[in-house]
Swiss-Prot record:
Entry-linked InterPro entries: PSII_PsbK (IPR003687), PSII_PsbK_sf (IPR037270)
Transmembrane segments: 36-56
Protein name from the UniProt record: Photosystem II reaction center protein K
Keyword annotations from UniProtKB, A to Z: Chloroplast, Membrane, Photosynthesis, Photosystem II, Plastid, Reaction center, Thylakoid, Transmembrane, Transmembrane helix
Family according to the record: Belongs to the PsbK family.
GO terms of biological process kind: photosynthesis
Domain of life: Eukaryota
Length: 61
């Protein structure tokens, strides 16, 4: 179980800290989308957490 949490932590850190390294700057016409694009790497984590909430709702059948 510790390995799963370590992997999640590594993925979150790499998504948060290396986003400036892998991606360039948006063109000026799309500058208003910067807050949304900064948030996008975290969205798959919400789907992962939603799976646990869903399973808890159906009593982990």
């Amino acid at each position: 179980m510790l390995n799963i949490f370590s992997l999640i932590w590594i993925c979150l850190n790499s998504a948060l800290y290396s986003s400036g390294f892998f991606f360039g700057k948006l063109p000026e016409a799309y500058a208003f989308l910067n807050p949304i694009i900064d948030f996008m790497p975290v969205i798959p984590v919400f789907f992962f957490l939603l799976a646990f909430v869903w399973q808890a709702a159906v009593s982990f059948r």
